[in-house]
Amino acid sequence: FDTFGIDLTHWKWLIELCFLVVLVSINLIAVKVFGEVEFWFSMIKITLICAMIATAVVMIVIGYHYPAVQIHGVDHVSPAGHAGFDNLFANFSFAPNGWMAFLMSFQMVFFAYEMIEFVGVTVSETKNPRKVLPKAINEIIVRVLIFYVGALMAIMCIVPWTSFKPNKDGSFASPFIMVFQYAGLNWASALVFFVVITAASSALNSLLYSAGRHLYQLAGESPNPTLNKIGQVSDRK
């Protein structure tokens, strides 16, 4: 909301509470509801990434040149440039901001691979785990190449790494917003914001699912009868 100049400082607690109530309700209804919601959350994220990659490909093919643009969330004007593979190697430097900055970037990479243990939590509620899980795990490398490496290459072909400059407060603009605005799609910034909200909701939804399953396991194994009752669930699937 800060990106669009909307001050919700005094209402953040209410927004957070509403999101929490909705996501907890989803997890309490049935696991199939959780799965359906996660499916659509994932589809929204995948659609945005594919749209961004497709936009970048079109810009590269036609040799698109863009003017200097005031990007949403940036306190300075981003320089003019062009779309092309040469942006990947222009002014190339392995660690332009020093080795410490390079090492610090790993925390962002590791963050992207958190919750891998979530695969193990879902085994007990998968219809055919012997068939489904190996397939899902083997497809991870393909998904990483397309949605992670592919997206990074698409962004860097449009926006040279030298164009990423921090604001006065140290923050950076979303590279997705930069690509869309360079393409002249100024309205896409609101779309990216919506996808960020769904991505955060998806992460919280998965955490609630995982926490609920762990609490259920602990309650079932507890020698305390009271905790055993807490671990009782309905027949809904």
Predicted regions and their residues:
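Helix-loop-helix connectors at the membrane interface of multi-pass transporters/channels
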Residues: 1-14, 48, 122-129, 135-143, ...
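Hydrophobic alpha-helical transmembrane segments of multi-pass membrane proteins
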Residues: 18-25, 103-110, 191-205
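Membrane-interfacial loop-to-helix junctions in multi-pass transporters
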Residues: 8-14, 94-99, 182-191
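Internal metal/ion-chelating core segments
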Residues: 83-163
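Extracellular/lumenal inter-transmembrane loop segments of multi-pass membrane transporters
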Residues: 1-11, 26, 31, 61-92, ...
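Juxtamembrane transmembrane-helix termini
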Residues: 29-36, 55-65, 124-127, 154-161, ...
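Membrane-interface loop-to-helix entry segments
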Residues: 13-79, 110-114, 137-141, 145
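TM-loop-TM module centered on a large, flexible mid-protein loop between adjacent transmembrane helices
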Residues: 1-3, 79, 89-92, 136-205, ...
